[in-house]
Amino acid sequence: MASIHKDILIDAPAHDVWDAVRDFGAPHRRLVPGFVLDTKLDGEARIVSFANGTVARELLVDCDDTRRRLVYAVISERMKQHSASVQVIAEGEASCRLIWIVDLLPHEIAPYIDGQMDQAALAMQKALARSAKVESGFAADRALSRYRGSK
């Protein structure tokens, strides 16, 4: 099983970021506009239409306002397993961290999902704050960070 971790520092108050994350039916408007084009609620699930043409059914597993943590699972024939959690942690009054973890099978699709998460993180940064930094558990992301730091 592959596990992908994203740690996104956002220059916005945690309560504002959490409000966008927990709005399960509106990621296309509030959280990742441009990356997600449309979302339709279907009971405890949402049907998400992505800009790349992919459509995914995401089942809401848990939404915990106290811990600012949302958990969802993707229901797909392509994947045996896809569970994700998003947690918003305050870093002072004006900034926060968004911790996004995805566990999936088959592990061969991890590079694709990792790339999609990077694109989503950029859309999040644009929507939620003008200045944000993404830290990833993948070596390619660390190399890119080092490259950018050398300029």
Predicted regions, residues:
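Beta-strand secondary-structure signal
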Residues: 5-7, 47, 57, 71, ...
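Beta-strand/loop substructures that line and gate deep hydrophobic ligand-binding cavities in soluble
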Residues: 74-127, 135-138
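Glycine-rich portal/gate segments that line the openings of hydrophobic small-molecule binding cavities
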Residues: 25-78, 83, 119, 130-136, ...
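A short, structured loop/turn motif at beta-sheet edges
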Residues: 11-15, 62-66, 88-97
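Hydrophobic ligand-binding cavity/cleft-lining segments
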Residues: 1-40, 145-151
